[in-house]
Amino acid sequence: MSTSAALAPALLPRHIAIIMDGNNRYGKVNHLPKGHGHVAGKDALDPIVEYCVDTGIEVLTVFAFSSENWQRPPSEVTLLMQLLTSTIHEQMPRMDKYRIRLRFIGDRSPLSAELQALMADAEEKTAHFDAMTLVIAISYGGQWDIAHAAKQLAKQVQAGELCADDIDKDLLGRHVQLADAPAVDMLIRTGGEYRLSNFLLWQSAYAELFFTKTLWPEFRAAELASMVAEFAQRQRRFGKTSEQIACAQQFP
């Protein structure tokens, strides 16, 4: 049994987000052919998904391809698109076995029609599964997400359906990606870098941050379990003082 498996459900993060960094460095360190670090990274996802299902995590969101990744060499972008396609195909039996809902977030307009159709089909076929939700962020950026939400509200104002003075953070929050999912409780970045890289900026406003030097292809469920156990020990204050939190816990 993992360290976190015995934790009370109230102590578990409902939503874990992961920046899967370190694939290229893993390939270089292990002298793999160019691009094969990404292949190893694709395979590393499966045990993490299974851990989350077994532990009772509601939502797992992984950063597969950022809006900035389009700037990478065309050959690498092509490989990444191929891997995303194969990942979706390979994940479908797992989604069916564990009753996992598969969702995608991001700007789909630059993606090929074939990939867009595959994503839509996967979402439709798993829409009724409720054991967990796996979200794959493709062509996603946090700034794009917020700007996209703002544009939606601007169109409503322009159409006379909304008064500009009625726009607040709650209304904007209902228009960002994953508005219907729990806010991110725990954000993990592998690979040793200490930055958010434009990932889920709105949704992670009060997330607990975890950084590890472990490269993504070497990231294992045991390390995730240790992080979840540490998460359960942290005091999340959401702007309040520790004394206020302690008082609320004593007199719920």
Where are these regions (language model features)?
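Flexible, compositionally biased loop and terminal segments
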Residues: M1-P252
